[in-house]
Amino acid sequence: RDTDRSRGLGDVYKRQVRFCEARVWSFYNMFNKSVGDTYLPYIQGDSKEPMPLYIKPSRKLSVRDVQAAMRDHYEGTPLDITNDPGAGPFKTPYRLSPLSFKVGDQEYFNERPISTQQTAFTFVAQMRANLPDAIGGVLWFGTDDANMTVFAPVYCCSDRIPDCYSGKEADCVTFSWDSAFWIYNWVADMIRPRYSLMIDDMRAVQNNLEDTYANAQAGIESSAMSLYEKDPVKAKEFLTNYSCMTAESAIDSWKKLGEFLIVKYNDGAVKKMAKDGTILRPETGHCAPLVRPGYPKEFLEELVKATGERYKICLLYTSPS
């Protein structure tokens, strides 16, 4: 309990920690642009007026809105980190830990966006008072980084843990192909180094799964409600089975995604795609049709500026024999 009544409630929640305040600002900015504009100077250190503890969004938010917000890296704002040298050639919105570093005697920091690679698990809680508790509470849950996981539904009445979440076969030093945590990490760690090149392939699978779960929700809950009116135990069993099924189906899809990515982007080249979304097979031999995208133009220009004529192609001088 704070005994100093002169302090505001927000002060109790450790104001002025830049790493955390920027994340709060980003949420505010996404859901109320006017508030975001007002407090940008505070985040940039140009104003001493702190942000409020909470705000009213400019519109009603959906579960999908909040899921998208959990994946934010300040893209499209003055805090965007995809356009400085730390992003590398493929504009990764991630920075390696630790949060701070020194050059000489001066200390600097890395931005800490809402979505970070070291996340263990993430969720969006959906609570609806107009439904029985067993049906009205859903935890949209994913393991690892929110940006590159799948938010699958776990109903609050569930009394069984999906095998892929259980940790039976894996821990922090033991990889398992049956572990959601390790499968999501496996795919994410492939994508981050070539983020702008590979992220769209991941996003297509992610959106398909999450759209499927969202579109199925009303029907699933209608069926659960019919069961609940007759036998609440059967309704809870039904929703538990559904929660386990969606978690496992997401992991099955993610394994296939990982297999697809390692083939398509093998060794820095990109294999060509057929109209049906499969990788083109070679007509003869063992080399599939591919392109070599190399590095982006902007990166190459900066490379030449930094290295001068170090990599300039020239003919080696050969003495006459």
Regions found by a protein language model. Give the residues of each.
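Extended, compositionally biased non-globular segments
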Residues: 54-133
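Axial heme c-ligation environment in periplasmic c-type cytochrome domains
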Residues: 47-55
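Long, charge-rich alpha-helical interaction segments
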Residues: 11-31, 35, 39
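A compositional/structural signature marking long, glycine- and acidic/polar-rich segments
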Residues: 1, 5-7, 41, 89, ...
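Substrate-recognition/cap regions that form aromatic- and gly/pro-loop-enriched pockets
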Residues: 101-215
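Helix N-terminus capping/helix-initiation residues
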Residues: 15, 50, 61-63, 144, ...
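Histidine-centered catalytic/metal-binding microenvironments
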Residues: 205-319
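Single conserved hydrophobic/aromatic residue that forms the stacking wall/gate
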Residues: 2-13, 317-321
